[in-house]
C-alpha cells in the first residue's frame, strides 16, 4: 500500500466514523422511495388529517415502529416548517446497560452528520454553541450513547420528508430530580435564546423543539401490569394515558402543569402506580426548557394540542407491503405500547 493510498483510506475511515450509523434498520424507514411510498399510504389512510392553522413551536412525537405507529406520527410532521430542530431524546436502558448509569446530565454527540433516507442530515451550529457555554459538569459528549439510542433517529425520516435541508441538535436527557431539571433548563434556555438572538431566529419559523416519547409500556415484558393483562386492563391503562395528556399537556402549559406532569409520569419513592412512559424525563425537561425560551422571547404563552393517541394493540400492523420495514416487537394484551403526537403553539396570555 502506498502512502497516498494509506492516507486516503484513513480519511475514508475518519469520514465514515463522523457520520452517525443507523441504529434501527427494521422499525424505521431509511430508503427515499420507500419513505415516499409510506407517506403516500399514510395520506390515503388519513384523508381527514390537514395542517392546523396555528404555527407550532414545539411538539411531542412517538418513536415506535412505523408499521405500528405510522398513523400517530402522520398528523404532526406536516406542521413543522422550520430550518432547524432541537430534539430531546430518551436515554433508554440499552444505553445505560452499555455505558452504566447516567444521571443529572445531558448527552451530546460529536458526529458531523446523521443519516436520513434523503441523504445526510446536517448538525446545527447550536450543538457546539451549547458545548461552549454549558458548564462541563452539566453534559457529556458520547457518540457511543447516541449510536445506541434510537429515540432521536426515529424522527428524522419524517422531518426530512418535509424539509430535505433540516438541521438538528440531538440532546439525550438522562434521569434527574426536578431541582436539577429546573437549574439545567434555566441554563440551556439562556444559551438557546442567546444563540437564536445572534442568528435572528424566530420560534416556529427558524427553530423548533421536538420531544421524543412513547407512552405507557404495558405488560409482563415491562414488569408493568397493575390492571391485569386483558381487554379491561388495556382499556384502563390507555384511559389513564389519555387522562394525563388531557389534564397536563393540553391547552395552557403553565409551570404548575409541568410539575403535575412530573407527578404523574416520573417515578418516586412512594408505592403509587406510575405509567411507564419512556420519554418521561425528556417531556418534563423539554417543556421546562421550551416554556423558558418562550417566556423570554415572546409575551404569549405555550398551548398544547393533542393530534392523536393510540397504541400497538389498537393499531395493530399497517398493511404496507414490499418494503424493508418490519417490526421489532410483538403485541398482545401482555405486551403493548401507547403513543401520541402533540403540538405546542403560542397564544395570548389572557
Regions found by a protein language model. Give the residues of each.
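Sec/Tat signal peptide C-region and signal peptidase I cleavage site
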Residues: 7-11
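Active-site histidine-anchored catalytic micro-motif
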Residues: 12-284, 288, 292, 297, ...
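Long, Lys/Arg- and hydrophobic-enriched amphipathic alpha-helices
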Residues: 293-349
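Bacterial N-terminal signal peptides
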Residues: 1-6
Amino acid at each position: 500500500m502506498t502512502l497516498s493510498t494509506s492516507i486516503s483510506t484513513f480519511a475514508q475511515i475518519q469520514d465514515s466514523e463522523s457520520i452517525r450509523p443507523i441504529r434501527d434498520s427494521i422499525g424505521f424507514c431509511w430508503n427515499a422511495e420507500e419513505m415516499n411510498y409510506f407517506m403516500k399510504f399514510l395520506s390515503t389512510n388519513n384523508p381527514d388529517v390537514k395542517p392546523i392553522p396555528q404555527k407550532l413551536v414545539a411538539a411531542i412525537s412517538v418513536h415506535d415502529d412505523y408499521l405500528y405507529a405510522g398513523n400517530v406520527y402522520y398528523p404532526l410532521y406536516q406542521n413543522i416548517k422550520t430550518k432547524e430542530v432541537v430534539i430531546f431524546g430518551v436515554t433508554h436502558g440499552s444505553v445505560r446497560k452499555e455505558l452504566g448509569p447516567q444521571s443529572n446530565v445531558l448527552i451530546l454527540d460529536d458526529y458531523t452528520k446523521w443519516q436520513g433516507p434523503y441523504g445526510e442530515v446536517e448538525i446545527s451550529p447550536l450543538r457546539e454553541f451549547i458545548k461552549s457555554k454549558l458548564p462541563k459538569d452539566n453534559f457529556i459528549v458520547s457518540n457511543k450513547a447516541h449510536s445506541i439510542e434510537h429515540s432521536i433517529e426515529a424522527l428524522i425520516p419524517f422531518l426530512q420528508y418535509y424539509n430535505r435541508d433540516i438541521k438538528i441538535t440531538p440532546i439525550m436527557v438522562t434521569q434527574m430530580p426536578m431541582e436539577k431539571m429546573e437549574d439545567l433548563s434555566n441554563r440551556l434556555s439562556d444559551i438557546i435564546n442567546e444563540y437564536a438572538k445572534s442568528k435572528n431566529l424566530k420560534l416556529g419559523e427558524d427553530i423548533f423543539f421536538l420531544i421524543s416519547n412513547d407512552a405507557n409500556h404495558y405488560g409482563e415484558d415491562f414488569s408493568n401490569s397493575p390492571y391485569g393483562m386483558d381487554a379491561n386492563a388495556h382499556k384502563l391503562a390507555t384511559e389513564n394515558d389519555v387522562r394525563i395528556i388531557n389534564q397536563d399537556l393540553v391547552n395552557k402549559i403553565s409551570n404548575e402543569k409541568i410539575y403535575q406532569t412530573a407527578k404523574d409520569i416520573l417515578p418516586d419513592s412512594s408505592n403509587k402506580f406510575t405509567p411507564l412512559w419512556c420519554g418521561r424525563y425528556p417531556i418534563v425537561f423539554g417543556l421546562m426548557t421550551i416554556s423558558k425560551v418562550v417566556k423570554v422571547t415572546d409575551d404569549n404563552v405555550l398551548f398544547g394540542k393533542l393530534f392523536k393517541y393510540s397504541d400497538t394493540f389498537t393499531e395493530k400492523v399497517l398493511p404496507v407491503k414490499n418494503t424493508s420495514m418490519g417490526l421489532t416487537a410483538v403485541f398482545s394484551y401482555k405486551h403493548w405500547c401507547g403513543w401520541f403526537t402533540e403540538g405546542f403553539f403560542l397564544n395570548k396570555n389572557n
